[in-house]
Amino acid sequence: MIEAEATVERRQPQTREAAEQPTPVKVKKIGHVVFYVSDIERSAKFWTEIMGFRISDRNEHGMVFFRYAGDHHTIALAPAKEKTPVAKDGQVAFHHCALEVGSVAELFKIRDFLRAKGITIIYEGRRGPGGNPGVEFLDPDGFKIELYAAMDQVGWDGKSRPPEQWQRATTLEEAVASPLPGVKY
């Protein structure tokens, strides 16, 4: 038996340096990543049997949502269609990256800030699985970015919100005016 002792220097957490121009975008964490896949069932098997994720939900578009801990989903898969972007080497492409912000109130400020900067909002509101209000836009290279808040958490019983409670909303205002059961923004 080998015994080892390690000393780890504890450092103070670093704070984010202020941008040259203030921004209301303050990311708490990378929330989830969505991939286009060529075979949804093969990929679902990989993410569950190899990577250890659990399926939270499937939606009517064939998407599969996976969780690793409490968030409703941290990985999601979308079936590739004819017009799905494809990388130069023929691989199926990235769908989007989602970043969590602190609150729905912050989302309103972020949306207004993005618009003032001339960035087109391609989606805002609340989709189905996960119940999280969000704002989506493209980065300069055309990658879809989602900023969101208040994602559903999956409890110890492993059950997520039933589909009949998903209540989609097409604006942030609508999402706040009609919160999901048990949610206060």
Q: Which role does the model predict for each range below?
A:
Residues M1-T23, K29-S38, V86-F113, K117-Y185:
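Vicinal oxygen chelate
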Residues E5-R10, F35-F46, A78-A87, E173-P181:
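Short N-terminal helix-initiation segments at or just after the protein's N-terminus
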Residues G52-R58, I121-E124:
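Short secondary-structure junctions
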